[in-house]
Amino acid sequence: MKVVIMGDSDTVVGFRLAGIHEAYEFDLSELSIERARNKLKELVERDDVGIILITERLAQKIGELPQVNLPIILQIPDKFGSIYGEELLREIVRRAVGIEVKR
């Protein structure tokens, strides 16, 4: 199964250099976001795609991501870092362990 990357130019180039050949670049313009939504729908329907990596900023602009078992859709930080940071980590710990971690 293939790993696919969707994101900004810098992130996509990095993953191409790491060996991911199926990569799609999108900026955050309205037209590009619509193209990204369509590409994501297309990728989710393919049988040969196992993991879709998508930058957090692009995923946020797309809105609701498909809720599917396969392919696995993973949000990754871009060159500016995570937009979720501690909040996401707290939620993951809360779900996994059943307790809320606070400072």
From Swiss-Prot:
Membrane topology, from the record: Peripheral membrane protein
Pfam families: ATP-synt_F (PF01990)
Main localization (coarse): membrane
Keyword line: ATP synthesis, Cell membrane, Hydrogen ion transport, Ion transport, Membrane, Transport
Subcellular location: Cell membrane
GO molecular-function term, one example from the UniProt record: proton-transporting ATP synthase activity, rotational mechanism
Taxonomy, superkingdom: Archaea
Signal peptide: none
UniProt keyword Ion transport, yes or no: yes
Any GO CC annotation of this UniProt entry: plasma membrane
GO BP term (any one): proton motive force-driven plasma membrane ATP synthesis
InterPro entries given in the database record: ATPase_V1-cplx_f_g_su, ATPase_V1-cplx_fsu_bac/arc, ATPase_V1_fsu_sf
The family this protein is said to belong to: Belongs to the V-ATPase F subunit family.
HAMAP family xref list: ATP_synth_F_arch (MF_00312)
Purpose of the protein: Component of the A-type ATP synthase that produces ATP from ADP in the presence of a proton gradient across the membrane.
NCBIfam families reported in the protein's UniProt record: PRK03957.1
Subunit organization: Has multiple subunits with at least A(3), B(3), C, D, E, F, H, I and proteolipid K(x).
Name this polypeptide is given: A-type ATP synthase subunit F
Organism for this UniProt entry: Pyrococcus horikoshii (strain ATCC 700860 / DSM 12428 / JCM 9974 / NBRC 100139 / OT-3)
Gene name in the database record: atpF
